[in-house]
């Protein structure tokens, strides 16, 4: 899975790709070609 800063152009790579929001992160998942998986949103800094 790749981590990218913008998934705007990556959501149209295949007709089976779909955008899903889980736990505050955006994912592009593709059932037909799992190599196309990407995630947007990184780790948040925790307060001590």
Curated annotation (Swiss-Prot):
Pfam families for this protein: Ribosomal_L36
Domain of life per record: Eukaryota
GO cellular component: chloroplast; ribonucleoprotein complex; ribosome
A single GO molecular function term of this UniProt record: structural constituent of ribosome
Acyltransferase as UniProt keyword: no
Cited InterPro entries: Ribosomal_bL36, Ribosomal_bL36_sp, Ribosomal_L36_bact
Keywords attached to this entry: Chloroplast, Plastid, Ribonucleoprotein, Ribosomal protein
Subcellular locations according to the entry: Plastid, Chloroplast
Main location: plastid
One GO process term, biological-process aspect: translation
Family of the protein in this entry: Belongs to the bacterial ribosomal protein bL36 family.
UniProt xrefs under HAMAP family: Ribosomal_bL36
Designated name of the protein: Large ribosomal subunit protein bL36c
Organism this protein belongs to: Rhodomonas salina (Cryptomonas salina)
